């Protein structure tokens, strides 16, 4: 009785994979929405898709400039790669087409993310070590200073 109210779902056609590791990368919510949409429209065999900023913006309810900002963030994080395309119109003119997005393997982005974290931690440790040495040097100078005569 209960099953007749639910439509049958084809798990191959009605879903798209979103790696769990994406949530550990610290992406902004807008970048996550844009990445999710690109995963939704990608060709699963070539890992590529064509979409304009306007099309993505309409899908995720953002302006094209905001989409451009989040696409830049995704490129910097190493999640996607963009390539400019061009089209030839019927009257023979060459015009800019939409971007070709290539979704890169998530493992590279995760490795880059953790390498950046480790580099930041190393820098902070080095700064702390230098601060302690400077404090010790200043304290030693104060102890060795001659009292005024």
Can you describe what each PLM-predicted range is?
Residues 1-66, 94:
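Short recognition helix of helix-turn-helix/winged-helix DNA-binding domains
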Residues 1-10, 22-24, 120, 127-149:
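N-terminal intrinsically disordered, low-complexity, charged/polar
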Residues 65-134:
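Winged-helix/helix-turn-helix nucleic-acid-interaction surface
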